[in-house]
């Protein structure tokens, strides 16, 4: 009977063949493998209908390509914020929905969720993995939690205090260059170029206790870091190069690998030498003596770190964290400082008020140097920094891919597995949160005006359990560099308005050019 029933298919006796059954089982598994994500997308698309969305380009591309890394892209984000006010749905192709969020109340349940519930989305950051390894930026789960606990003491104010001297020294070197370049009265300078070298100079001294003199002469290591940042940003813009197989066959891919090797070799050599020194000079007691003398660098702190079970970090872990700090600490601070100087150049009345505040603080002090305790004595300068970070946040967005449904304040739900794109730029430019958001107004951060405002309205360093661990380091460096710069130079805007360019960090197309005029000793 079975033979008869299958004969219409032309199978005859072969219908009972175990090979055919195996083939059918394999086909069923393949079909399930294909259909399951499609069903998931279909189910999510139904659940996401409660989120409005702008018009798509077409059903294949979705919204892909509507936001470019350009001035126009940022203006488009501002139009989304004005239209949707809190959140909208965004389709990357036909299968990948993203919820873009730009209001503090809707950001809150995502960023304040436990780190294991709201891990960082790694779609973009995976390009950094060969360079940064499993450092805090890239790691997830238990490894991230363990490293975060172990690294938190590295950013205690007792560790950071001695770094202020480094910030002063590196800023002084930069200013000596500016004085030479402005010997005829003034000079037009690309702020990103000069300040990036200054922040890298500081970081090398704070992380490795190494002075490469990179502000005065070329450094292979510094050149490699700058090149890696450029290559990652460029790769992100070219979809075909997202495929590793293609990328590493290109000239850019080969340059990326070469620069990675150079950076890793430098960090590995420092770690090996430091461990050898520890063995020769008495091990952990040497580090404890350095800690007492307040001369620990970041590598020392990592070598001292132990988890709750007494287990130390491996050399590979130390390299990943050191490389991550070098990456995360130079570009963001350079972007922040460059845009702060731009905003003060456009508002000379605020620039002059900051200058007077610094002069009053350093009155009759020789040498003119900012100390740790001074950082809390510059309230207006701090307000100007914060307002610039609001208007021009170095990192314009962060992403989370939640492992469970996230319920928003109005009852809408972001389904598990859907990426949440938290627009720092959009939140900072949201007129429902910040009146006249395009106006540079430092008094927004006056103590009276801060009252009643959500702490998530201002998130240049992210927020929640995965916020920036080095934000105090960054703010301290910006305060020192800005205070000394305004004490010694008048900063004037270029005739041409810069076009913003969001990449890994917020840059300006062709650089951010400003005019600097040295102030006479009497004027200082």
UniProtKB/Swiss-Prot annotation:
Catalytic reactions on record: leukotriene B4 + reduced [NADPH--hemoprotein reductase] + O2 = 18-hydroxy-leukotriene B4 + oxidized [NADPH--hemoprotein reductase] + H2O + H(+); leukotriene B4 + reduced [NADPH--hemoprotein reductase] + O2 = 19-hydroxy-leukotriene B4 + oxidized [NADPH--hemoprotein reductase] + H2O + H(+)
Coiled-coil region(s): none
Record has Oxidoreductase as a keyword: yes
Name of the molecule in the record: Cytochrome P450 4F3
Topological type in the membrane: Single-pass membrane protein
Inducing stimuli: Up-regulated in bone marrow-derived dendritic cells by bacterial lipopolysaccharide (LPS), a ligand for toll-like receptor 4 (TLR4), and by poly(I:C), a ligand for TLR3.
Disulphides: none
Location in or out of the cell: Endoplasmic reticulum membrane; Microsome membrane
UniProt main location, coarse: endoplasmic reticulum
Pathway: Lipid metabolism; leukotriene B4 degradation
This protein's GO CC annotations: endoplasmic reticulum membrane
Task of the protein: A cytochrome P450 monooxygenase involved in the metabolism of the pro-inflammatory lipid mediator leukotriene B4 (LTB4). Hydroxylates at the omega-1 and omega-2 positions LTB4. This oxidation step leads to LTB4 inactivation, which is postulated to be a crucial part of the resolution of inflammation. Mechanistically, uses molecular oxygen inserting one oxygen atom into a substrate, and reducing the second into a water molecule, with two electrons provided by NADPH via cytochrome P450 reductase (CPR; NADPH-ferrihemoprotein reductase).
